[in-house]
Amino acid sequence: MAPALSPTRSHHVAVIGAGPAGLVAARELRREGHSVVVFEKQKQVGGTWIYTDEVESDPLSVDPTRSVVHSSVYRSLRINGTRECTGYRDFPFVVRSGVSRDPRRFPSHGEVLAYLKDFAKEFGIEEMVRFETEVVKVSPAAEEGIGKWRIESTEKEKKVRRDEIYDAVVVCNGHYVEPRLAQIPGISSWPGKEMHSHNYRIPEPFRDKVVVLIGNSSSAEDISRDIARVAKEVHVACRSNPADTFIKQTGYNNLWTHSMIESVHEDGSVVYQNGKTISVDIIMHCTGYKYHFPFLDTNGIVTVDDNRVGPLYKDVFPPAFAPWLSFIGIPWQVLPFPMFELQSKWIAGVLSGRIPLPSKEDMMIEIKTFYSTLEVQGIPKRYTHRMGNTQFEYYNWLASQCGCSETEEWRKEMCLANGVRKEAHPETYRDEWDDHHLVSEAYQDFSLYS
């Protein structure tokens, strides 16, 4: 066991990002008695949930000199998980009155942003936030003592650069900014337009076009249907589909699902593994994102290798820097907000000395064992942080560390049922459901916090 910190000791902690992870991190750290400064590049809280019509100058978002747009939200986006499962555990995402509020069970991105602002207001988070302040560099400040961190930041308006020392840093900068792209044979000579879904906002630019989307994510499903309203043809290609896949989507006369692209050619054609050849105007990569920490300088100790952030104990602490450096929100295929809350409680309690960590050696042994297990199971490195149905074991482990209750059974059942419904009825799952008994259980729990 690592030496325990002084019980209930207060530390000066920097939180990077005022999105849904950073907001709840700030609350939990302050609740535990720490002093907190939150660094946020934008003018308001909300992170990726702040919608903007603006897109990047490079539609693929690979040009390092581009002006980066943080949000990946498109105008028609509605959440793909239920309202009940989406909210923080002790601040339910319930319907609120107001002319601009969205009362639907699967509301729009604007309703999520409004909820996050409600949360920030309720817990006085904004007083801890430095808005329009970008973190330029985070590095160990060994000369200042064990666990100290130097943060260099710039304020947009004042053009002031600060150099400050903190006891600990919690990284909450999200991972929906730096796109991953599919590797397509022949793409360098293909004459059409390529883009990433990060830069998709509205369907109108695709009117009368033949469009290919690559990916099987929720964004690929939603955007393909959004575009199909105006496009000439929409084709969705997916690596996980069998090679002979060619399916016309029910309810559409211009939307097909294919196997993966085999190659593209100078004449504008796209050849699929199923043997189909189609002349295409636009290829959109709906292929996810890379973890990206451009400000973090750990001298190679914390790395991103094929989308594995490591080494991280329980997806949060790099052993060499624990507990003074931590990450919130690394796992995916999860219930994000409740997970952020539990990770935040754990970090806050570890920093105060209330919750012990294993020794650095024991943490590294567990990490290496986990990596070996993934390798034996044939799981690619890029899926290291994918959880899916194992997420609930993780939440309950976090809860056990923090001394709080495990994930509610209704939340687990609702999440799993929604996944089944989404798979079976992708067109209607947001507006038709049959889990009213679980909704009732959820609202009985919510009454404890009203």
Swiss-Prot record:
Its cofactor is FAD. InterPro entries: FAD/NAD-bd_sf, Flavin_mOase, Flavin_mOase-like, FMO-like. Its EC number is 1.8.-.-. The keyword Transcription does not apply. NADP(+) binds at G215, N216, S217, S218, S219, A220. FAD binds at G17, A18, G19, P20, A21, G22. GO terms for molecular function: flavin adenine dinucleotide binding; N,N-dimethylaniline monooxygenase activity; NADP binding. Coiled coil: none annotated. Catalyzes the conversion of methylthioalkyl glucosinolates of any chain length into methylsulfinylalkyl glucosinolates. Belongs to the FMO family. This is Flavin-containing monooxygenase FMO GS-OX-like 3. It comes from Arabidopsis thaliana (Mouse-ear cress).
